Amino acid sequence: MKAIFLDKDGTLVDDIPYNVEPRRISLCPGAGSGLRLLARLDYHFFVVSNQSGIAHGRFAEADLKAVGNRLADLLFREQIELEGFYYCPHHPDGSVARYALDCFCRKPLPGMLLNAAQEHDIDLHASWMVGDILHDVEAGNRAGCRTLLIDNGNETEWRLGPRRIPTRIAPDLYTGAVLIASEEGARR
């Protein structure tokens, strides 16, 4: 199985910091049509998201269930199935002791992608990590995926390194999907 791993905030949905209110969650413009294009190429969809608001006490981990349900509903309306919603609740500087730690799941480390790959038999080399910051790119590269940076202005720490170079760059998810589709066509 090949997958599209999607960062949530700023990539798939509009970026409203620490938002867990389902009514305020909406897909980024062009996200639905871009994902439909990729679904026709037999990609499966997974969200992988750092949710440090849990570690910082901004919201409870239980609040993410409603977020996952809202994402699944929004994508269902676009005729897309969300097959997994993975999140990291940790942050080393968190104020909630249980979550204030370094971990392997927090991007830029690849833990969420590797867990999804193991649980769903995903071919990481045939998959893409799509996100709006270089931590997303680094996580995808560390996992062995191809990577797409959505350059929408959200990246503020342009610390470059060999693992932080994306395979492709696009201004939005729809344009990125077209690039992925064209690369897929070139491989055939």
Please tell me what each predicted stretch does:
Residues M1-V47:
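Active-site neighborhood of HAD-like aspartate-dependent phosphohydrolases
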Residues Y18-S26, F59-A62, Y99-C103:
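Short glycine-enriched, charge-decorated loop/helix-capping segments at active-site entrances
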Residues A31, L35-L74, I80-G94, G140:
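Substrate-recognition element of Asp-dependent hydrolases with the DxDx(T/V) motif
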Residues N50-Q51, D151-N154, L173:
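Short secondary-structure boundary segments
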Residues F104-V137:
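Conserved Lys-Pro-Asp/Glu-containing loop-to-beta segment of HAD-superfamily phosphomonoesterases
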Residues H125-R168:
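Acidic, Mg2+-coordinating phosphoryl-transfer loop and its flanking beta/alpha structural elements
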Residues T167-G176:
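Short acidic-hydrophobic, aromatic-tinged amphipathic segments that line or gate anion-handling sites
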